[in-house]
């Protein structure tokens, strides 16, 4: 009788030790207490904020708040995303951006609704520079250009 009681109590303690962290966070959020183990809980287990208050670093899904990034690097939830996938966003929002300034011109931009001056692939620091690789209908923009002279492309595929 004593061994079975000891076995059951050890089993309950082991189950309590392997409690899911999700359940712990929900318990902390709603301030629920376990009536059987109140003496074990002296204080809350963590001082971290709940997940409902945090903006996700990586989010998958279509429905989100306007401007919510899909992949974000940094602690500020309102930070401009470095990598964004989606159709419904501002026309100037980059899909892939390298740099800290959110108003920086994108290096790589894919989309139909981009302004004609927006580069599809650009290498360099100056956003006003002609892109090195540009795929589009504009005949003035080079398709592939290597070198410093920006007057004419070295490789051009097109009608004009």
From Swiss-Prot:
Residues 18-43 form a propeptide. Expressed in the ASE sensory neurons, the DD motor neurons, the 15, M3 and M5 cholinergic pharyngeal motoneurons, and the ASG, ASK and BAG neurons. GO terms for biological process: neuropeptide signaling pathway; regulation of cellular response to heat; regulation of circadian sleep/wake cycle, sleep. The modification Phenylalanine amide is found at residues 60, 73, 85, 98, 110, 123, 135, 146, 157. One of its GO terms (cellular component) is extracellular region. Its main location: secreted. Residues 1-17 form the signal peptide. GO terms for molecular function: neuropeptide receptor binding. Disulfide bonds: none annotated. It is found in: Secreted. Keywords: Amidation, Cleavage on pair of basic residues, Neuropeptide, Repeat, Secreted, Signal. Belongs to the FARP (FMRFamide related peptide) family. PANTHER family: FMRFAMIDE-LIKE NEUROPEPTIDES 13, FMRFAMIDE-RELATED PEPTIDES. Probable FMRFamide-like neuropeptides. Binds to neuronal receptors such as dmsr-1 to promote sleep in response to cellular stress also known as stress-induced sleep (SIS). Plays a role in behaviors associated with SIS, acting in concert with the FMRFamide related peptide, flp-24 and neuropeptide-like protein nlp-8. AADGAPLIRF-amide: Inhibits muscle tension in somatic muscle. Acts as a ligand for the npr-22 receptor in vitro. Acts as a ligand for isoform a of the dmsr-1 G-protein coupled receptor in vitro. This is FMRFamide-like neuropeptides 13. It comes from Caenorhabditis elegans. The gene is flp-13.
């Amino acid at each position: 009788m004593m061994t079975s009681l000891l076995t059951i109590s050890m089993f309950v303690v082991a189950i309590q030790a392997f409690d899911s962290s999700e359940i712990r966070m929900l318990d902390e959020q709603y301030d629920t207490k376990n009536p059987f183990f109140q003496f074990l809980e002296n204080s809350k287990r963590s001082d971290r904020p709940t997940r409902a208050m945090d903006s996700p670093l990586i989010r998958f899904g279509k429905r989100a708040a306007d401007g919510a990034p899909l992949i974000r690097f940094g602690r500020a939830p309102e930070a401009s995303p470095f990598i964004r996938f989606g159709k419904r966003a501002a026309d100037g929002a980059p899909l892939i951006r390298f740099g800290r300034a959110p108003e920086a011109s994108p290096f790589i931009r894919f989309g139909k609704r981009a302004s004609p001056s927006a580069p599809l692939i650009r290498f360099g620091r100056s956003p006003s520079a002609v892109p090195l690789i540009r795929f589009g209908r504009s005949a003035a923009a080079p398709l592939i250009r290597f070198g410093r002279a920006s007057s004419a492309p070295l490789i051009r595929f097109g009608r004009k």
